[in-house]
Amino acid sequence: MEPEILSIELIKPSSPTPRHLKTHKLCFLDQYRNHAYFPMVFFYSVTHDTNLNLSNETDIAQIVSVRLQLLKQSLPETLSLFYPFAGKIKDNLSIDCSDEGIYFTEARFKSPLKEFFNQQNFSCLTYKFVPFDAKELEGSISGLHVAKIQVTSFACGGIVICACLSHLFADGATLCSFLKCWVATACKNNEQRISPNNDASWLFPQNEAYPKEGTWLAMCPRFFGHGRFVTRRFVFDAKAIATIKAKASSSTRVQNPTPTRVEAVSALFSKCVMAAFKAKHGSHKTTLLTHSVNLRNKAKSILSEYSMGNIVWNANALCTNEEAELDLEGLVCKLREAMMKINGDFVKSLLGDEGFLNLCQAIKDENGVCSKAKERINFSSWCNFGLYDIDFGWGKPMWVSVIGLDGKLPYFSSTIILLDTRFGDGIEAWVYLLEEDMNTLELDKELLALATLDPCPLW
């Protein structure tokens, strides 16, 4: 199954961006990031239109056409608020907001959506919905689009929307804010329209003295492998998460004995992936557990929920050789201790005249921790983002995903992305590992007793 590309166009904001906003300066938190598109993928069924004959191809084509037009017609007004999304990357420090337009692709599969889910390892095939390829991660970034969207229709009338954003510009929370604004615009719900906040550019002003060795890629290149990275999706229901929580809070060792579902699942994967690393090396190697922390939640009096940019920082927990046999409770302790350090005081330390110096110290500290580790596991949680509320008027998505990367990228790092399940009480874990490590992880009895590997999201 391969999609047919029907059209590619640039959709411009409904009103021109003011002259003084034509250049969007990245903040120094953005300077830590490298360019890479990260996608959010939304799968929608056709079944909410009960007044149409779904056995009639003409009616199905009409449904798709109406929905597609709604998406396209509501984008310009959304882009007038989120104007950098219609821009291009100028260099490592700025976005050219000359309103060239957001990159918008229409594609089509001639088969019904259920056939996509009937394929073996269908989660690994979600890359077919993205409007970019691996070549855009190489070479010059100048002139690349900040954001891209692809809408793919199926013969049954189902639609898949993939929205991608450059990590050089902003994080997942920013993309989620854009999507919520797009939904409110499409549904003519002005009360729910989000106005983004550009406070990060002056709270954390960019600095040309930012160390070149202080970017995500440059700091620890040995953690970015050039082998074959593969993707697997592990799904935990509410019962499984309750079991993990119970195992991770079986004594009074933890001050707050009940871990969150994100802490519990992160601890489980830390244990299981480190066991896979041990099987490869023959012994435990010091491993760095890195969890992205949303700074907006840590300093609500300073930052808006809708602040644009990479308003995140890494919480790092080092598991040394002496800590090779930590149980789930011990791993929850380590992760929580690391994440608690990324707090309101940390955000305040980045403000004012000393802010950049304190950032440089934080980079130096992370570099020091990285130098002690032989392996690294990166965690990013998109739970509680409200992604299943992205409803353009024809119903909530039946599935929200990221993408599979089996052999598709020139380099990558061991990464686990956590998402809500459709009903909000479970977690989907998208795991990206070198194939050798994944082969071991897929045999982990403790993990398989708790998670289901790549279940179909249709039921």
From Swiss-Prot:
Keyword Disulfide bond: no
Top EC class of this enzyme: transferase
Active site: H167, D391
Pathways per UniProt: Secondary metabolite biosynthesis; terpenoid biosynthesis
Reaction catalysis annotation: (1S)-1-acetoxy-luvungin A + acetyl-CoA = (1S)-1,7-diacetoxy-luvungin A + CoA
Tissues in which the UniProt entry reports expression: Expressed in maturing fruits and in juice vesicles.
Enzyme nomenclature, EC number: 2.1.1.-
Any one GO MF annotation of this record: acyltransferase activity
Entry keywords, A to Z: Acyltransferase, Transferase
PANTHER family reported in the protein's UniProt record: F21J9.9, STEMMADENINE O-ACETYLTRANSFERASE-LIKE
Similarity field: Belongs to the plant acyltransferase family.
Subunit-level organization: Monomer.
Function per UniProt: Acetyltransferase involved in the biosynthesis of limonoids triterpene natural products such as limonin, a compound with insecticidal activity responsible for the bitter taste in citrus. Catalyzes the formation of (1S)-1,7-diacetoxy-luvungin A from (1S)-1-acetoxy-luvungin A.
Name of the featured protein: Limonoid 7-O-acetyltransferse
Organism: Citrus sinensis (Sweet orange)
Gene: L7AT
